[in-house]
Amino acid sequence: MMIDQNKIIGQEKNALLTHFNLDDVDKLVISLKKIGRENFDKVCILIKINKRIVFFHAGTQTTNENNLWIHKKANVVDKFDHSSLFEKAIYEENPDKFYINNGLSRRDYAIVGGGFPIGLESTGIIGSLIVSGLTDTEDHDLAYQALIDIQSQQS
């Protein structure tokens, strides 16, 4: 199944916020709980602002493996300012090229969905929202839908 790069770029642009700071973190968590519903216990969630960890949630049905995936997905978003699913789409036909072309290790980076940039309309990418525990596209969609939800509260 081909992943649509243009759709993902569109999602990243659509999810831009007017503002996001420490006061907004709780609102994002509430959105994640509301949208994730019964899946909230199945996921780990990491929120970063300027590469600083400002929130972490480990669902009751998660393990340390989810923490490892969170770290790898976060590294992709931090390095490329795009969602980890976008990077997966670029290298879908040859994932090894991602690691070779960028001199990166599979130990520290993973091109699977679930890492999503937090961006502002005025300044660009200022953080990341990382989800791990569902399928990679479900992780991506949960992050995207939660950002769209708090965006709707800002307008």
Curated annotation (Swiss-Prot):
Family according to the record: Belongs to the UPF0303 family.
Spell out where the chain crosses the membrane: none
Give the organism the record lists: Lactiplantibacillus plantarum (strain ATCC BAA-793 / NCIMB 8826 / WCFS1)
Span of the secretion signal? none
Q: Which PANTHER family match?
A: PTHR28255, UPF0303 PROTEIN YBR137W
Q: Which InterPro entries match?
A: PduO/GlcC-like (IPR005624), PduO/GlcC-like_sf (IPR038084), YBR137W-like (IPR010371)
NCBIfam families for this protein = PRK02487.1-5 (NF002696)
**Protein name per Swiss-Prot or TrEMBL:** UPF0303 protein lp_3613
